[in-house]
């Protein structure tokens, strides 16, 4: 079993936690960096990919972005923005000497990849795996309200619409509607059979999520509300594997928009998967992940 190393990187006067699976070897295989979703979701679910370190003899790096998990802090709304999180990724690469790497990002992590490639133009990135991310907050909002919400019971649609109209995101009816929405399009298929790392209590970054994104998945009101990169996807020169689930918050239109816009990209639409394809379709996903990274090492 691969060696696990944990540590902290100083960042903006705070500490960013990281977890490394496996060791760097002179085998031509670049490490894989994992960018979690949220903002504020923690690295935990990426531990399902620990096996890739052994199966592919490759070092894997995951971390809790500032504001959540073992990097938790709150009371700092000035920190919850794209630049802080992208600078943190850049700092982590320098801190750990990850001059060459592959990067996988899920949900918000996929947004990070898109902005990182376009705005930072980083060197040494072998490939991207964009898992259920998106290039446009307005597209994500439209798909959430137009496509996903309209499959829900009318009383739940009414509760969501009332919250959006009034700005009051509280109450039993609203909470029940959001829970149903997330269960349909986000939560793991596996239920009680989910891996321990997916059920483990975690210190989510609630403040970073609300300040960065908004009160729920379909109402971006935070600092990322103007995240719009559709017209610039052609600037991404990094080979990109796009993955999404058939019942995903990342609708087929969102995923296809990325696949159409990013040169040298490939799209896999997973059946029996929601917003975390690498959990719901773990074994098949790992096969494709390993195949993709080896192609571009």
Model-derived regions, located:
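Conserved HGGG/HGGXW glycine-rich cap/lid loop of the alpha/beta-hydrolase fold
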Residues: 14-74, 78
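Active-site loop/oxyanion-hole signature of alpha/beta-hydrolase fold enzymes
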Residues: 61-108
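Catalytic active-site module of serine/aspartate enzymes centered on a nucleophile-bearing elbow/loop
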Residues: 264-297
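Conserved hydrolase catalytic core segment
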Residues: 99-143
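Active-site acidic short loop of glycosyltransferases
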Residues: 94-100, 122, 237-238, 264
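Alpha/beta-hydrolase
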Residues: 148-151, 155-238, 257
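Conserved loop-alpha-helix segment in the C-terminal half of the alpha/beta-hydrolase fold
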Residues: 223-273
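N-terminal cap/lid segment of alpha/beta-hydrolase-fold proteins
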Residues: 1-15
């Amino acid at each position: 079993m691969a060696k696990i190393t944990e540590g902290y990187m100083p960042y903006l006067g705070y500490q960013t936690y990281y977890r490394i699976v496996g060791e760097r070897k002179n085998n031509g295989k670049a490490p894989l960096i994992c960018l979690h979703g949220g903002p504020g979701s923690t690295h935990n679910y990426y531990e399902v990919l620990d096996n890739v370190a052994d199966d592919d003899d490759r070092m894997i790096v995951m971390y809790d972005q500032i504001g959540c998990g073992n990097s938790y802090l709150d009371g700092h709304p000035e920190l919850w923005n794209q630049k802080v999180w992208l600078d943190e990724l850049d700092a982590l690469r320098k801190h750990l000497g990850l001059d060459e790497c592959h990067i996988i990002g899920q949900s918000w992590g996929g947004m990070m990849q898109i902005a990182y490639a376009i705005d930072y133009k980083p060197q040494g990135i072998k490939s991207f795996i964009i898992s259920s991310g998106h290039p446009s907050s307005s597209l994500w909002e439209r798909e959430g309200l137009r496509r996903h919400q309209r499959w829900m019971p009318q009383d739940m649609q009414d509760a969501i619409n009332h919250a959006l109209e009034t700005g009051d995101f509280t109450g039993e009816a609203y909470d029940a509607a959001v829970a149903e929405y997330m269960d349909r399009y986000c939560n793991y298929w596996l239920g009680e059979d989910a891996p321990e790392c997916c059920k483990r209590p975690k210190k989510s970054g609630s403040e970073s999520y609300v300040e960065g994104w908004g009160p729920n998945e379909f109402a971006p009101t935070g600092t990322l509300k103007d995240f719009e990169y559709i017209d610039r996807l052609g600037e991404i020169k990094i080979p990109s594997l796009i993955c999404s689930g058939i019942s995903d918050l990342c609708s087929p239109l969102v995923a296809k928009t990325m696949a159409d816009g990013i040169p040298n990209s490939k799209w896999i639409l997973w059946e029996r998967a929601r917003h975390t394809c690498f959990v719901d379709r773990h074994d098949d996903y790992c096969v494709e992940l390993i195949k993709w990274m080896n192609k571009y090492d």
